[in-house]
């Protein structure tokens, strides 16, 4: 799935991506969560547009994030290993069966540091909460960092 400033896109059949996305959500949380995703029209998986030509797409869209998922974690691990070769990119997972690729500066911790500076606060005046790998940059930048007991272990 490719996330841009104006929507969600895929290079494959949107219905297949939607089905697999819901399957993945159901596998890692509950079947009820999968049903919620299946019926909530605001969810990205329900608003995918198929890309027919990549070159014009990348020339006209501002890409925020690329996400890949697979029920088997081995292909995801292989992609993560390959991504280590590239500078300027950050990758993380919110579970064992996905990888999210963003610009290296697109991290919650860096964004929060900028925001609190704008508010006139110091890092010692901020507490952060997170439960997944996409929260790690906040934990690295703020000493008052907490995660619930049931959070992702990496």
Regions found by a protein language model. Name each.
Residues 3-129, 133-138, 150:
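Conserved acidic, metal-coordinating active-site core of Asp-based
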Residues 154:
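Acidic helix N-cap motif at the loop->helix transition within catalytic regions
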């Amino acid at each position: 799935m490719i996330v841009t400033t104006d929507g969600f896109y895929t290079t494959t059949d949107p219905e297949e991506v939607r089905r697999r996305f819901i399957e993945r959500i159901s596998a890692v949380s509950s079947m009820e969560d999968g049903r919620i995703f299946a019926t909530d029209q605001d969810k990205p998986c329900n608003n995918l547009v198929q890309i027919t030509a990549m070159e014009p797409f990348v020339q006209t869209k501002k890409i925020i994030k690329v996400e890949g998922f697979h029920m088997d974690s081995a292909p995801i691990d292989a992609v993560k290993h390959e991504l280590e070769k590239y500078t300027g990119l950050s990758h993380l997972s919110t579970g064992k069966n996905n990888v999210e690729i963003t610009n290296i500066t697109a991290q919650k911790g860096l964004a929060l540091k900028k925001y609190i500076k704008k508010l006139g606060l110091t890092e010692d005046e901020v507490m952060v909460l997170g439960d997944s790998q996409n929260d790690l940059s906040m934990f690295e930048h703020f000493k008052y960092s907490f995660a619930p007991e049931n959070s992702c272990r990496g």
